[in-house]
Each structure stands twice: as structure tokens, then as C-alpha cells.
Regions:
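Conserved, single-site charged/polar hotspot
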Residues: 1-252
Length: 252
């Protein structure tokens, strides 16, 4: 989350990140005996070293560092709880105006990760709408690397078809060369910013139009900032994005 965001958004992010870590510690993570959590954003949580962050912030380094310290200290010990235990507090950069349910992305249904409205100020979000173009040869190579059973020959208009979309407008499933796969598979294969995408053939190439950034589940960082700017505090933000939860000090 950008350190320039509103203080209540930063507090919400601090609690979400803390809760995610607690969840991994309690559940044992998914790295066996080697670690509880990693810094790969596609697996666990992204991390940037303080010195690198300060270099990126330039003249704002001191004020941004203090903002983050304040957000962490103000929420010290607090976590997002469902049934008294920390939740899988996933988050993403920006949604398409409605978040996604966990089952729509990972096929495991979690009661606190349901679709909710998200106030995304598209005009102020970098690359909220993105356009990516692929030649047929490039697209074929990328898709076959992830979907080796796909038959990508014949008319190009039939290479991808029959998309099924969820309530957020993201692609749940799509037929790729005769193989039905989840939209997240195509997103990963093509490096798209989200699974909320449409496509068309344009001058012989495949052009994809993408909305938002990230998996779309849980807290939207830009949505959280919009809520904070509108007057919501961090507890209101968290209980909006995570259904049926409580925000409280967790002693373990």
C-alpha cells in the first residue's frame, strides 16, 4: 500500500498484514519446515527492506516512515478475527468495483471472504485500466506453457471463447483451445493485472482490456483509501471488506 494513503487506510493495512501473518503462523504456512511465510507476493506477502523503501520515497522518506510507524503502533496487537481466531486476511491493489469471493479464485469457500462493493476511484488509480497486445505466436506460446492440452489452431477467434463471469465481472472460467480453465490461469499465463479482462482480435493480434489489479479478494487497498478519505476509520474499513469479522486485540 502506498505510504501516501490516508492514515486510516494504513491502519487497516497494518491490521490486515499482521492478521495474515498470524494466520500463517497458526496454520503452519505452506512451506513445510522451512518457513511459515515468504516474501513472494504471488504466494504470501510482498516485502521491501526499509532502506529500499526510503530510497523510493526520496524527500518524503521521513514523513512516510513516521506515518507507517504510527499506523502500526496505533493498532498494536489488533487482528481481524472470525470465531475468535485470525482470518486469512488477503488483500489486493484494486478491484473492478466489487470484490470477489474466495471460492471464485481459489475454490475454497471462506465465510468472511465474500463479494462486497468497493469504491474504486478509477481516475486516480495508476493503470486501473490496462491494455495488453499479443501476436498469435506469442499468445500461443504463453498459453500452451500453462495449458499444454489446448488445441490452438484453426480460426483465431475460437482460441479463446465461452467466458463465464462472476458478479464482479472477472472471468471465472474460459475455454482455451477446447480446454476449460479458470480465468486466473489465463491471467497468470499472460501476465495480466487481474482476471477482470475482455479481449478482441485487432489487426490480427489479440488485444486484452483489463480492469483493476490483483486477485480481487478481501481488502482493496485503493478502495480502503477511498473509504478513509470519505471518513471511515480502519475498523469500519476492515469490517466492510471482511464479512462477519471483529477487530480486536489477539493474545493467542
Amino acid at each position: 500500500m502506498p505510504a501516501s494513503f490516508a492514515e486510516e487506510a494504513l491502519k487497516a493495512q497494518a491490521v490486515a498484514a499482521r492478521t495474515y501473518t498470524l494466520y500463517k503462523l497458526i496454520s503452519g504456512g505452506n512451506h513445510g519446515d522451512t518457513a511459515d511465510i515468504c516474501t513472494d507476493s504471488t504466494c504470501c506477502q510482498a516485502y521491501i527492506a526499509p532502506e529500499s523503501a526510503r530510497a523510493n520515497w526520496g524527500e518524503n522518506a521521513e514523513s512516510y516512515t513516521e506515518k507507517i510507524r504510527t499506523a502500526v503502533a496505533a493498532t498494536d496487537g489488533e487482528a481481524i478475527l472470525y470465531g475468535g481466531v485470525p482470518i486469512l486476511a488477503v488483500f489486493h491493489a484494486s478491484s473492478a468495483g466489487l470484490t470477489r469471493a474466495a471460492r471464485q479464485v481459489w475454490q475454497n469457500d471462506l465465510p468472511y471472504l465474500k463479494p462486497v462493493d468497493s469504491p474504486e476511484a478509477a481516475e486516480s488509480i495508476p493503470n486501473y485500466y490496462s491494455r495488453v497486445e499479443f501476436s498469435p505466436a506469442d499468445l500461443k506460446q504463453r498459453l500452451l506453457a500453462k495449458i499444454p492440452g489446448a488445441e490452438l489452431s484453426g480460426e483465431k477467434k475460437n482460441w479463446l471463447k465461452n467466458a463465464v463471469r462472476d458478479s464482479a465481472g472477472s472471468v471465472e472460467t474460459v475455454e482455451v483451445g477446447g480446454v476449460t480453465v479458470r480465468g486466473t490461469v489465463v491471467r497468470a499465463a499472460l501476465g495480466l493485472r487481474s482476471a477482470c479482462f475482455e479481449w478482441e482480435l485487432q489487426d490480427g493480434n489479440f488485444v486484452f482490456y483489463v480492469t483493476g489489479h490483483g486477485h480481487g479478494v478481501g481488502l482493496s487497498q485503493y478502495g480502503a483509501d477511498a473509504m478513509a478519505e470519505a471518513g471511515a476509520d480502519y475498523r469500519e474499513i476492515l469490517t466492510h471488506y471482511y464479512t462477519g469479522v471483529a477487530v480486536a486485540v489477539y493474545s493467542g
